[in-house]
Amino acid sequence: MTTPTAADVDRYLVDSLIGADAAPALVANAEAGLPPIDVSPPQGKLLNLLARSIGARRVLEIGTLGGYSTEWLARAVGDGGTVVTLEFEPRHAAVARENLDRAGVGDRVDIRVGAALDTLPEVAEDLGDPFDLVFIDADKVNNTNYVQWALRLTHPGSVIIVDNVVRGGAVADEQSADPNAQAGRDLVELLAAEPTLDATVIQTVGSKGWDGFAYAVVV
């Protein structure tokens, strides 16, 4: 018997626990030529479950791509809930809008186009109630900046999740020349030093390889 790979396990788990509910977005993203850097289906479902577990009604996402993770989060906030998502590339944002409207959750999602460090001040200015959950999956070198913004836009008990922190183990390599790995180390150091955050990092393995995400609670 051939030993199953991590990708095989992902396929089994998708078939058993997730199904094709949000799969059309992945297909549309591929057809539009978007880079295949969406979260995996098990990771998308995890985001959905985490948001539901804290009763999140207001979510901020930094890094939309084609809206796959956005759809999972929009399903979680329910009717009357809001996801504000920030995307640098106008074409990606347009694909995301089509995907979200097709999925029937477009009315829950506010897509802001532009560099996140430019649009975050606008989000802060427009802010009514603070966000219950922030999901960060954008340019890694700005993760510490994004977390600092997230702290301004959340409340005690809010959750901040940052994707792609482990980088195939490179986050533990002090000598790594990979700027994304160094960004991961900078993030871990910030999470350790910031008194208003209680955080951990969970390693993941699957069809997306070896990586991991930071999970922090605002205290």
What are these regions (language model features)?
Residues 1-135, 140-161, 165-219:
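A short alpha-helical cap/connector motif
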